């Protein structure tokens, strides 16, 4: 039986669990895409049907997979469990002419022996909804980039690009920057005091009310603050009451794609691309202290499943 995954690292990890009865090969990612030098999408009649081509660097891989699939009893498509992975499996079936009757889709969210055994015990067919979702995203990416980028070349400079997500994100950044520039700072003051009760530990308190008024008092400038301080000095204070309560702090939930990138940026100063590259390696499997290759995390692209 033939098993197709995306990368050699993933192939090694999966192959270790499956054993020699399975021939595990890597497609090296997508094997087909829209043509580089033309739109590749039918827009004249507004059908928006894409035309795909096998990239020159993938022709040898497709040829080898086609030959292996023809001689295999069953072809297991074990690409990633999201719309990109589903689309890769669909493109493989089309490009390598894999017989629909012998093709089976297996999905796992972690590369462990238990997860792989479960996936291969419960294969399914291709999810056409996920495939169509990926195609819609790819077509939109091409239409926006292909049509708008030349406008930017003429208006701004050559090489400037537009994108379905990129352009919206840039607009949000620009709008936020305008808000920052238009912000008029307003001076305000707060008053805090450190109390030293006789024989007790010190504690701090903030001025939250004057003469029983509701709401924190507004102190617009230093003069107002000094006036309030003059009234407060020499006054006797008493603790009118206190409250103790037990609080529970829940552990943080497991990372999703966005929170993983945010924490890696905050703690380690990693870029989003570096974070995802490292996460991909941890998912597909790495060698630890000379041991066999093992996958260490679940699938990291939670926003596209």
Residue ranges and their predicted role:
Residues 4, 55, 78, 82, ...:
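Hydrophobic alpha-helical scaffolding
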Residues 72-76, 154-156, 240-247, 258-267, ...:
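Glycine- and acidic
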Residues 86-87, 110, 134, 138, ...:
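An alpha-helix initiation/capping motif
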Residues 270-305:
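Extended, well-ordered alpha-helical scaffold/bundle regions in very large, multi-domain proteins
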């Amino acid at each position: 039986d033939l098993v197709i995954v995306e990368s050699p690292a993933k192939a090694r990890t999966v192959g270790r669990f499956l054993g020699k009865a399975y021939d595990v090969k890597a497609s090296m990612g997508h094997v087909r895409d829209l043509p580089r030098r033309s739109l590749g999408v039918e827009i004249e009649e507004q059908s928006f049907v894409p035309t795909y081509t096998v990239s020159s660097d993938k022709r040898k891989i497709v040829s080898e997979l086609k030959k292996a699939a023809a001689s295999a009893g069953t072809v297991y498509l074990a690409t990633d469990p999201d719309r990109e992975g589903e689309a890769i499996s669909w493109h493989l079936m089309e490009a390598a002419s894999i017989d629909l009757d012998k093709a089976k889709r297996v999905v796992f969210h972690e590369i462990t022996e238990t997860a792989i055994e479960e996936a291969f015990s419960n294969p399914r067919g291709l999810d056409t909804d996920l495939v169509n979702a990926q195609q819609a995203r790819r077509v939109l990416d091409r239409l926006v980039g292909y049509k708008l980028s030349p406008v930017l070349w003429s208006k701004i400079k050559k090489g400037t690009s537009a994108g379905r997500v990129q352009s919206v994100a840039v607009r949000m950044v620009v709008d936020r920057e305008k808000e920052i520039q238009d912000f008029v700072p307003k001076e305000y003051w707060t008053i805090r005091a450190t109390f030293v009760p006789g024989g007790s530990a010190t504690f701090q308190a903030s001025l939250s009310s004057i003469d029983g008024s509701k709401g924190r008092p507004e102190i617009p400038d230093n003069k107002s603050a000094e006036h309030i301080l003059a009234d407060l000095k020499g006054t006797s204070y008493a603790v009118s009451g206190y409250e103790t309560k037990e609080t529970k702090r829940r552990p943080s939930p497991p990372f999703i794609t966005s929170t993983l990138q945010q924490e890696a940026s905050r703690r380690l100063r990693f870029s989003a691309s570096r974070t995802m590259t490292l996460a991909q390696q941890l998912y597909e499997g790495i060698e630890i202290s000379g041991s066999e290759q093992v996958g260490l995390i679940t699938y990291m692209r939670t926003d596209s499943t």
